[in-house]
A protein has these predicted regions:
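Long, low-complexity segments enriched in small/aliphatic residues
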Residues: 232-249
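Glycosyltransferase specificity loop/lid
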Residues: 2-221, 228, 247, 256-288, ...
């Protein structure tokens, strides 16, 4: 028997926005490599604090795009910070989105005019280009290289402008915008909020990022005067989402939209826990909770009143253990605080979730943590902080697998009631 294998040369264009986005792109690269394809990843280094490449199996080209150290991190997570009002309707957030967009435009200008890089990539003769939803620059790079097929991906749930580029309309009357604090049963005021959030985010994406980056490629002669990067995005062959239709708000769909939710979730293995962790989780009590707010929001940055509310709520449930991700704990150390609180700078999260005494996670509504909780078959208490956390948390509440709390209204009583809801009601 003779078998024929057709290997494609595939280019992923990945700005280093955050670890979760890098991980999603890395998982896609690994899946493609497993199927015999040749994968190159161009990492546009917009954030120097993100050191991960997502994979060590693909060819990695990490490109310095002239962004000063820590600039994107400061722009994203300060003034206001993650524990403050982060609605896109907050003028400070709009200003922040515009600052971040200007960073991406600068990075795009640098990478598009990097002649040695473009010459090297041209020699690779790529068949497919893959780019994520938050930056149009990749479409310009693919046009520069003459890549015939493009795939538009999202490490989160779907961003409305993606399906709409392919002709699938998402009615704002019942489909929540990715950054909006509403579900599909919106009140009149909820619908108004949804429309306003959609207007603000689309303005930043289309009328700033897309237009400014389009100018970059027009100056280089890649795009005609009448053509925009948004036009190029409409020629995408498919959209790949890190989402699951069964765990989302009902919305229009297309055969061009592919769902791969859970691709970033590693298999559980209780044997991954060392003796120190086993001595903590195997205590003769009612189990343990995990508390983590992702890689960006630091526990130390919590307002004192919020931190005090958490500590008082933990003390109320003396027969539960609360394991808190705390960046101030020395690396590799596990510190016990009080009778039932453990703090550490790093959590073996999936291994802890696989343990039978794991009760629930208190977290920020990041999509990766939600998918891991679903995989572990455990409920959640979600306190959305920014970006897509709002919509993610609304989905969790709508599906009945978690409790949603408002970060602007956190009190000891709210936290106690939320924990009691999880421990006393089967989900």
């Amino acid at each position: 028997l003779v078998s024929f294998i057709s290997s494609l040369n595939i280019l992923l264009f990945v700005p280093t926005l955050s670890f979760s986005h890098i991980a999603f792109n890395g998982n896609i690269a690994d899946e493609l490599i497993d199927r015999g394809h040749n994968v190159t990843i161009v990492l546009s280094s917009v954030d120097d604090t993100v050191k991960s490449n997502g994979t060590n199996r693909a060819e990695i080209l990490r490109i310095d795009v002239g962004i000063s150290n820590g600039l994107l991190t400061r722009s994203l997570w300060q003034n206001p910070g993650p524990y403050e009002d982060s609605s896109p309707l907050n003028p400070l957030i709009l200003a922040k989105l515009l600052r971040v967009s200007s960073i991406f435009v600068k990075a795009c200008t640098e990478i598009a005019s990097n002649t040695p890089l473009i010459d090297y990539l041209n020699k690779k003769k790529f068949d497919v280009g893959i780019v994520e939803q938050y930056d149009y620059c990749g479409f310009g790079i693919f046009s520069t290289l003459g890549i015939p097929s493009t795939v538009w991906i999202s490490a989160t749930a779907v961003y409305r402008l993606q399906p709409e580029a392919l002709g699938v309309n998402y009615p704002l009357s019942y489909v929540p915008e990715l950054f909006a604090h509403v579900d599909d049963r919106m009140s009149l005021m909820g619908k108004l909020e949804n429309v306003l959030v959609a207007t603000v985010t689309e303005m930043v994406s289309t009328f700033y990022s897309s237009i400014e980056e389009t100018k970059v490629f027009r100056r280089l002669g890649v795009l005609a005067k009448s053509e925009t990067l948004k036009d190029v995005s409409r020629r995408s062959h498919s959209i790949v989402l890190n989402a699951m239709p069964i765990f989302d708000i009902p919305m229009p769909i297309s055969s061009q939209i592919v769902h791969v939710g859970g691709i970033t979730v590693n298999e559980r293995s209780e044997t991954q826990l060392n003796t120190d962790w086993l001595s903590i989780v195997n205590q003769p009590n009612d189990g343990f909770f995990l508390i983590t707010f992702g890689a960006i929001a630091k526990t130390r940055d919590m307002p004192p009143s919020m931190s005090r509310s958490f500590n008082e709520a933990f003390a109320f449930f003396s027969n539960l253990t609360f394991i808190v991700k705390d960046e101030d704990v020395p690396k590799g150390m596990i510190e016990r605080r009080g009778r039932n609180v453990v703090r550490t700078s790093w959590l073996p999260q999936m291994a802890l979730m696989a343990h039978p005494k794991f009760r629930a996670i208190i977290t920020h509504g990041g999509w990766s943590s939600i998918l891991e909780s679903i995989y572990a078959e455990r409920p959640m208490i979600l306190m959305p902080l920014f970006a897509d956390h709002a919509k993610n948390s609304q989905v969790v509440r709508a599906k009945g697998v978690g409790v949603l709390i408002d970060k602007m209204r956190v009190t000891t009583t709210v936290l106690i009631d939320s924990i009691r809801e999880i421990t006393e009601n089967t989900r």
